[in-house]
């Protein structure tokens, strides 16, 4: 299918073939990263440095940020904004239901309550930090992509994907780790800073390495949808859901 450049303000409520699938994948990855990876610190051996700690949630980053980049690059800021809000609501609902289920009295013969609480008993501080960091980081990422696309005339996609990751992940990490772990038991201030910097650097590195894959996915979706959306005249406030 031929690809035509379209201003976002002329799209209205245009229906896209693959948007729903991209949205569902994005929300699913965000939920998995919060359930499985957010609270664990792993370590990696670096030559000349030794063992260096990093957050296990980094394993989900390659998928989540490719999808995040695709949403804005292919479908425009307004649709990406709706997906970010959907992800935010999904994380809040997951956290609420985790609290409810953990608080339910266990059956007398069920001996796994303590282990269950370790896995799903998220402390309010971590939930608050996670939601704030996700929301702010994703909107910065989307905004930078949309703005840079206008500045570059849609050329040099790699500058947008890498530039938006540098900015968005800086905001995400600077919000999440201090809010979640500064002064927490088992977390020294040095460890918080190490994990924060490592997460940011690894995510930027992932984005650089995966740039060819991002090009393939973006190219496929633009051809499948037949449009290349530019956010001319877009209202970039995050506090609205209209297209």
Segments predicted by a language model, with ranges:
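Membrane-interface interhelical connector segments
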Residues: 100-125
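Alpha-helical transmembrane segments and their lipid-water interface positions
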Residues: 37, 41, 94-102, 137, ...
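N-terminal membrane topogenic signal
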Residues: 9-25
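Central hydrophobic cores of alpha-helical transmembrane segments in multi-pass inner-membrane proteins
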Residues: 59-70
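Internal alpha-helical transmembrane segments of multi-pass membrane proteins
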Residues: 151-170
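Alpha-helical transmembrane segments of multi-pass membrane proteins
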Residues: 27-43
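Short, highly charged, low-complexity non-transmembrane loops/tails of multi-pass membrane proteins
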Residues: 217-243
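Transmembrane alpha-helix/helix-exit interface in multi-pass inner-membrane proteins
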Residues: 91-109, 130, 134-138, 169
């Amino acid at each position: 299918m031929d690809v035509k450049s379209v201003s976002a303000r002329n799209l209205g409520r245009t229906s896209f073939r693959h948007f729903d699938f991209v949205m569902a994948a994005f929300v699913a990855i965000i939920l998995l990263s919060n359930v499985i990876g957010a609270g664990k610190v792993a370590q990696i051996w670096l030559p000349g440095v030794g063992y260096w700690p990093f957050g296990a949630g980094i394993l989900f980053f390659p998928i989540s940020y490719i999808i995040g980049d695709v949403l804005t690059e292919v479908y425009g800021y307004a649709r990406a904004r709706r997906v970010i809000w959907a992800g935010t609501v999904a994380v809040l609902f997951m956290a609420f239901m985790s609290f409810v289920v953990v608080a339910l009295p266990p059956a007398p013969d069920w001996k796994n309550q303590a282990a269950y609480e370790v896995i799903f008993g998220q402390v309010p501080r971590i939930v608050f930090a996670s939601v704030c960091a996700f929301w702010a980081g994703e909107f910065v990422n989307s905004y930078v992509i949309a703005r840079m696309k206008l500045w570059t005339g849609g050329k040099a996609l790699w500058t947008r994907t890498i530039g938006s990751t540098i900015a968005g992940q800086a905001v995400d990490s600077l919000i999440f780790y201090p809010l979640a772990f500064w002064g927490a038991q088992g977390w020294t201030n040095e460890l918080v800073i190490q994990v924060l910097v490592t997460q940011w650097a690894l995510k930027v590195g992932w984005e650089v390495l995966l740039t060819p894959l991002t090009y393939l996915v973006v190219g496929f979706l633009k051809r499948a949808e037949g449009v290349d959306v530019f956010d001319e005249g877009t209202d970039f406030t995050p506090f609205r859901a209209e297209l």
